[in-house]
Amino acid sequence: KPVEMLREAYECGCRDFGENKVQELKEKYDPNYEWHMIGHLQRNKVKDVVDLVSMIQSVDSLPLLKEIEKQCAKRDICMPILIEVNISREENKYGIPLSETADFVEQCLLFPHIKLQGLMCVGPLSEDRSVIADCFQQMQQCFLALKEKYGSEYFRYLSMGMSDDYELALQYGSNMIRLGSIIMGERDY
């Protein structure tokens, strides 16, 4: 969306902005805003992102984790991240399987320039609210179990819910919602 819309949202009190695409992030970047990378991130784009964002919400593989560590170590910075979980098990979505989340947490904790902050997911594309609710409930249970095991230092955020399902996500413990189209309007591709 146009930069003017971001400015207007900022003037209305929005401070954190998410972007799905690295190129669009680079075009819209303003250092006054807190930027989160929320879309799929390829390893070769990490070097372009780490200087621009305050959090990467879409970490879903060990090679990506290693590249973030490498780029952050070069800059002597620590990057807050969320682990993206493919809660709906949809093949067209990114994220690690729910069953692998605990093992992936252990990997994240090995890197000194990575600051694990929680989990992120994208709900299933479904008209059936009970299907979405079931996925969100599973995410909530996973988040709470990991928070109990590792502490709130590593599990501060459950980023779950977008413009179409954020109300349901809030019922299941989300404390970070991603409201792109409801605030900015639908994307023009």
Explain the meaning of each model-derived region:
Residues 1-150, 154-166, 170-172, 184:
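Conserved alpha/beta-domain cores
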Residues 174-189:
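Gly/Pro- and small hydrophobic-enriched strand-loop and loop-to-helix capping segments
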